[in-house]
Curated annotation (Swiss-Prot):
GO terms for molecular function: ATP binding; tRNA binding; tRNA-uridine 2-sulfurtransferase activity. It is found in: Cytoplasm. The record marks 126, 335 as: Interaction with tRNA. The active site is at residues 101, 198. It catalyses: S-sulfanyl-L-cysteinyl-[protein] + uridine(34) in tRNA + AH2 + ATP = 2-thiouridine(34) in tRNA + L-cysteinyl-[protein] + A + AMP + diphosphate + H(+). GO terms for biological process: tRNA wobble position uridine thiolation. CDD domains: MnmA_TRMU-like (cd01998). Pfam families: tRNA_Me_trans (PF03054), tRNA_Me_trans_C (PF20258), tRNA_Me_trans_M (PF20259). Keywords: ATP-binding, Cytoplasm, Disulfide bond, Nucleotide-binding, RNA-binding, Transferase, tRNA processing, tRNA-binding. One of its GO terms (cellular component) is cytoplasm. The gene is mnmA. Belongs to the MnmA/TRMU family. This is tRNA-specific 2-thiouridylase MnmA. Disulfide bonds join 101-198.
Amino acid sequence: MAKIMVAMSGGVDSSLTAVLLKEQGHDVTGVTMHLWEGDDNGIMESQCCSVEMTAGARRVCAQYDIPYYVFNYQKDFRKHVIDYFLREYSSGATPNPCLACNRDLKFRVLLERAELLGFDGLATGHFVQITGGGEQPYDLRRGIDINKDQSYVLYMLSQRELGRLHFPLGGFTKPQVRQMARERGLVTADKPESMDICFIPDNNYRRFLNEERPEIMQPGPIVNRHGTVLGQHKGLPQYTIGQRKGLGIAAGSPLFVIEIDTVRNLLIVGDADELERRDFVIDDVRSVYGQIEAGIYAVQIRAHGEAVPATITPREDGTLHIRYDQPQRSVTPGQAAVLYRDDRVFGGGRISTERYS
């Protein structure tokens, strides 16, 4: 049996992960990453870093005689997640902080610490599956619960990392997970889901940006493709590609955000057809198998979106050109584009602010 560190948020998924591994005979230790202290707005009870949620993890570990520790990673979180979040908004992109946290903290910093402490591997409660191994490469696959599948936010995992990771919940649905937790009497069995932006407790990221980077929240013109001024925006980070509501302009037909120009501080709007794109570029490319070959893949550009066929062409600078068979709406710079074949993840990258032509 293996010695496994389990990253525990205090929710039902990571709690059951620890218990299942313990029941399988593994030597399990629970660990919570203390990432964010919060501010005057406090921490919501459903947040993964809240006192209440951490207490849940501690109680589950006590119930099953699992050693439990809290590691302080606030400085790393500031560097790798908060600063990234602010940097992306400053460049006109829409960040995904969960991706940054997985890439730079959970599956790099924490995994490295687990190895230094003598653990054989790290486990989390993500709904994904790992197959293969031995003489075959490891495969990262979607979880069987399509509504909870989290492979989109784990596309950056390498062969080395997959060989040290455990995802016991990938073969279960969320209702099954909750039921198994209830059967075991876990106090976290009916805990609500944690919020996406864990470091913004009131979910008001505009307030957060105003406090952290007021200089990027300057108002400016809203224009169409022809440069006609239609109104004034309240700061570019308050908008995202495809947004329709909250623009504060009147027009004869619906208008959507189609481009964010940080150089000229312009919010560019247009009709629905102008949202469609067939071609775009992804940078910071990661591959499960070492490199991504040219070819046809199903490409997913939103966490719970559909993976749609596209042709992938590697470029000399290490980026990938993606060309969809059919135009897609709201291709959003800063978000991830993840490449699949069937349920298998091949890799992905960040949708670039570069306009491909």
